[in-house]
């Protein structure tokens, strides 16, 4: 624990200093120096505590203390330092030579503070009272304005970011769709570039003479020829198919029974094109097998078979031979065509 304060000792005098006490203190310090302030009162013969002797010497009895009235420059310095430092009188006193902190404090409270109040200046903030009142309301208005501007700015930035994201997504989607279309069109283009002359052409609908164009033949099949054979024409097909690309191709299917009918069957265009374009050789044999087949016996449509049911085996055999010779003559024309063979390769 610390020492007890010297002022608490019994028999010590308090209150204002008398001239006799000031004289004793001055005489002792001039002769011996102040030394220890705690033991100085007993040596100097004073009924005072050491703290009281120190303050009396520092604030009043020092020979370098400047007495008298404060100048205008000193007043301005005190006001400026008080605005910066506040009530730190010891720090203010260091900037005023030969002026004590106690004297500066007393002069502030008795003169300078009252003068500022009369001028309409707050002695604490050193600002006009009207400005202090308006500053509180002005700060609130400025804060509200800044908050409103910040909200608009944040909303604008969010909108710009959202538009940028949507534009990027649309660009990526368009790019992916183009890639998918290019990938799907690549196999067809590769297959068709091998033999471009074998592409089928869609016959004109609505004409009386419709042509069935072969990839390797220039033979024209009229509608009058196809009807007795039981081959359906384009007029009997679906007329609602408006697709620009060929949606179906024709394939001949032959049944093995004696009353089999020769008919055309729609097959997917890719299977037929792959068979024609990507096949290696044997185009004439393939066309022959589709039209004639492996069996020698070919029947006419059902109506023709019923009409010739009473004919004998010999007449029936002669009719089949004539039919076979008829198709062989057509195939010979196909094989001997120089223009088609030139366009194929």
Swiss-Prot record:
Q: What is this protein called?
A: Transcription factor MYB106
Q: Give UniProt keywords alphabetically.
A: Developmental protein, DNA-binding, Nucleus, Repeat, Transcription, Transcription regulation
Physiological role: Functions as a repressor of epidermal cell outgrowth and negatively regulate trichome branch formation. Acts both as a positive and a negative regulator of cellular outgrowth. Promotes both trichome expansion and branch formation. Coordinately with WIN1/SHN1, participates in the regulation of cuticle biosynthesis and wax accumulation in reproductive organs and trichomes. Functions in cuticle nanoridge formation in petals and stamens, and in morphogenesis of petal conical cells and trichomes. May play a role in the regulation of cuticle formation in vegetative organs.
Tell me which SMART domains the record gives.
SANT
Q: Summarize the record's disruption phenotype note.
A: Overbranched trichomes.
Q: What is its main location?
A: nucleus
Location comes to: Nucleus
Organism of origin: Arabidopsis thaliana
Q: Which residues bind DNA?
A: 37-61, 89-112
Which SUPFAM superfamilies did the record assign? Answer: Homeodomain-like
Q: Can you cite an annotated GO cellular component?
A: nucleus
Q: One of this protein's GO BP terms?
A: regulation of cutin biosynthetic process
Does this UniProt record's set of keywords contain Transcription regulation?
Answer: yes
Q: Does the keyword Repeat apply?
A: yes
Please give the tissue specificity annotation from the record for this chain. Answer: Expressed in trichomes, stems, carpels, petals and stamens.
Sample GO molecular function, one term: DNA binding
Q: Which domain of life is it from?
A: Eukaryota
Task: Show which residues constitute the signal peptide.
Answer: none
Residue stretches making up the HTH myb-type domain: 9-61, 62-116
By its UniProt entry, which Pfam families does this protein fall under? Myb_DNA-binding
């Amino acid at each position: 624990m610390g020492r007890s304060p010297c002022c608490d000792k019994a028999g010590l005098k308090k209150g204002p200093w008398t001239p006799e006490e000031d004289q004793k203190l001055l005489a002792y310090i001039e002769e011996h120096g102040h030394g220890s302030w705690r033991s100085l009162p007993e040596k100097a013969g004073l009924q005072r505590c050491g703290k009281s002797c120190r303050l009396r010497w520092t604030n009043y009895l020092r020979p370098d203390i400047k007495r008298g009235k404060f100048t205008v420059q000193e007043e301005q310095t005190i006001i400026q330092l008080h605005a910066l430092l506040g009530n730190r009188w010891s720090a203010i006193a260091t900037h005023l030579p030969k002026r004590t902190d106690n004297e500066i404090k007393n002069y502030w409270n008795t003169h300078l503070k009252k003068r500022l109040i009369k001028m309409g200046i707050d002695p604490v903030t050193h600002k006009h009272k009207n400005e202090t009142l308006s500053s509180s309301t002005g700060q609130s208005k400025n804060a509200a304005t800044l908050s409103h501007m910040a909200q608009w700015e944040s909303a604008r930035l969010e909108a710009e970011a959202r538009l940028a994201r949507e534009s990027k997504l649309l660009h990526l989607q368009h790019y992916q769709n183009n890639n998918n279309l290019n990938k799907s069109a690549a196999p067809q283009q590769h297959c068709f570039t091998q033999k471009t002359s074998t592409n089928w052409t869609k016959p004109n609908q609505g004409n009386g003479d419709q042509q069935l164009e072969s990839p390797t033949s220039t033979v024209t099949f009229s509608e009058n020829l196809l009807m007795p054979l039981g081959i359906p024409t384009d007029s009997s097909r679906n007329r609602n198919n408006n697709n620009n690309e060929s949606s179906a191709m024709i394939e001949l299917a032959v049944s093995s029974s004696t009353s089999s009918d020769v008919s055309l069957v729609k097959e997917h265009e890719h299977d037929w094109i792959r068979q024609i374009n990507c096949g290696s050789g044997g185009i004439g044999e393939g066309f022959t097998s589709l039209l004639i087949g492996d069996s020698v016996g070919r029947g006419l449509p059902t109506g023709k078979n019923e009409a010739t049911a009473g004919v004998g085996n010999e007449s029936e055999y002669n009719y089949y031979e004539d039919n076979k010779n008829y198709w062989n003559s057509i195939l010979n024309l196909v094989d001997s065509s120089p223009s088609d063979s030139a366009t194929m390769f």
